Amino acid sequence: MGTIFIGTSAFSEPGWRGGFYPAGLPEQRMLAHYASRLNAVEVNSTLYRMPTPDGLRAWAEQVPDGFRFAIKAPRRVGLLPGAPLDRLLAVLPALGDRLGPVLFQTPAFQHADAGALEALLDRLPRALQAVFDFHHPSWQREPAVERLLRQAGAARAGLDADSGEVTAIPGSACVYHRLRRRAFATHAWASRLRAEAEQGLDVYAFVKHEADADSPQRAVALAQEVARSPAYR
């Protein structure tokens, strides 16, 4: 039985005070409060700047055992197996056992490039839970992409959005879903996540963060629906 991890794609939105967070809660206490209600977060800030070991350690110290951080690879890493990737791989161990998947996102203008994907996958440690979120539709049509991901044990993020859906491709260790709709079928998703966890893989589901407190409340509602399963902790 795998474990189900549920969260949002950020945790420090000021507009969540007075709803998800108590009014007046200092920003430095937001993560600890968040982790008391959800067991994972997809970190959006690392897309724009490289995380530091000290920053990652500080995050890890604020959350309980069993919590997971899904880290977005910085934009400058892209699909390039160079110095930025090496730096990212060097700092990630600072999270210790709180490290979950690492999400690599390609920009909407980047067409499918199986060669670039293969070069990056060749540089990733097999133990890393690598997940890819391809924004150009050509990646879904390129047959080599799924083959390369499966060979490397990497996953493709599933997408449930108003613009359409992308089916998740499980990795060797996890299944990853990004729930981008403001309204999604909570009961249906809970059943789906439980069924996937029963296959033995860890399952991650992240609700899109919004400026208001609705998104974390939707994540909590999904977690409560899933909580009847022993896979959620």
Language-model region placement:
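Residues lining hydrophobic/aromatic ligand-binding pockets adjacent to catalytic sites
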Residues: 1-233
